[in-house]
């Protein structure tokens, strides 16, 4: 048989779940402050793990945007939510200084020894704090934007996709949403 294997799509977290989770994340210790900043940023901007690991401090414009070097060394400037900006600012003011431990690094997110936080460690943080894979946050970001009415082309730009067909995997609308849109759009719906 010549069955084409379908790619399994990452889990999509509901907006109520992700909002509750981010709002209730512990925010006391240095690591908790760092982890909250990472998770807020990943959901805010749909970043890949590699993009988070390679972020530099100078790429963060206070509460406004973040410059990211994506796949194929493609640079893009992304808006960030106010909550992500606030979490990153808190991290930079206190937690990052403690983590840097008098070492000089321009990477934004640091590990407990003061060096660049690895992709493996970021995956572990997402799994521990959210209970899913990092790509699920990226997928959730794109899905929530599309469900909120964002144009596919805008989502493509935000995700850093060259090919629009890559972005189309995010257009799997829920059956409920499909029925709602049908009723709203069809003259006899």
Spans of model-derived segments:
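Conserved catalytic core of the tyrosine transesterase superfamily
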Residues: 1-189
């Amino acid at each position: 048989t010549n069955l084409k294997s379908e790619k399994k799509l990452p889990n999509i977290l509901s907006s109520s779940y992700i909002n509750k989770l981010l709002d209730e994340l512990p925010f006391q210790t240095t690591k908790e402050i760092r982890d909250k900043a990472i998770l807020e940023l990943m959901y805010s901007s749909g970043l890949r793990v590699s993009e988070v690991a390679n972020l530099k401090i100078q790429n963060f414009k206070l509460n406004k945007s973040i410059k990211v070097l994506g796949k194929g060394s493609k640079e893009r400037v992304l808006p960030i939510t106010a909550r992500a900006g606030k979490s990153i600012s808190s991290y930079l003011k206190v937690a990052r200084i403690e983590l840097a431990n008098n070492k000089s690094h321009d990477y934004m997110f640091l590990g407990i020894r003061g060096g660049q936080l690895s992709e493996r460690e970021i995956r572990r943080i997402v799994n521990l704090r959210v209970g899913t894979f990092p790509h699920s946050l990226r997928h959730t970001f794109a899905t929530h934007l599309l469900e909120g009415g964002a144009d596919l082309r805008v989502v493509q730009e935000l995700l850093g996709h060259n090919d629009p067909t890559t972005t189309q995997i995010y257009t799997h609308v829920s059956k409920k949403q499909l029925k709602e849109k049908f009723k709203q759009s069809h003259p006899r719906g």
